[in-house]
Structures are given as C-alpha cells and as structure tokens.
Amino acid sequence: MSDLYQIKSEHLQVEISSLGAQVMSIKDKEGLEYLWQGDPQFWAERFLVLFPYVARMSEGGYTYKGKTYHMDLHGFAKDTIFQVIKQEENKIVFFMEDSPVTRTQFPFEFGFEITYEVVEAKLWITYQVQNRGMEKMYFGIG
C-alpha cells in the first residue's frame, strides 16, 4: 500500500506518493493546483518516474549477454513502492533498489534515489543511480 508525503515552503506545497515516487500535487500558497490531476478517461497518472527504460521496447524486450528480458512499458519504477530514507519540511528522499523481481526485467544491481526539494517557489528534483555491480549498466530516466 502506498503512502502520501508532503513537503512545502512558504510559497509551494508538494504531495508525493511512495508508489513510484510520483508527484501527485503541486500547489501554490493560494491553493492553485499546477499539476494535471488525472482523468481515467484520458490518462489517470500525473508525474511518472520512468526507470530503467523510457517508452516501449521493440517487441517488449531486449537481449543482454545472450538472455532475453521482457520490460514493462516505461520500466518498473512507476509500479514500485519506494522507501523514504530522509524527510524534512521542504525535502524528501525516496529510494528503491534491485530485487529478484526487478532482475527478471533488468539484470543489474542498482540503487535508485530521488530527491524532491522545495526551495521558495521552485521544486528541485534530483535523480541518482548507483551501479552496484561490476559491469556497465545501461538505463534511462524520464
């Protein structure tokens, strides 16, 4: 089950879900919503984090070192519950890492950290990917 977290400054309030570390709301101090709020008829999502691949893979997968892997559309981060590893009033850090489930689609050892920070009326987003293995790791973020 996902949780909803809030960070804020004097000028901005941001809500982020632990499911996919997805930003769900960005409001100014008057309560004006800046983010699309989703509509199942068109597109129910808001602000997806796409990792380790952006878009659809040709034939739904790829071959690496002679083995074929099938990858979900836009990768698996959007469907993963992230851990919160740090939270302050204006900043939150989400984290996910490889697991037996992710390795069925992406055969690499990794850590993936997303930092959201509200500074005055701006939202800063920082992505950090750590390759924990010995081989070159290919990935994309969107």
Located regions from the model:
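Surface-exposed acidic/polar loop and edge beta-strand patches at domain peripheries
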Residues: 1-142
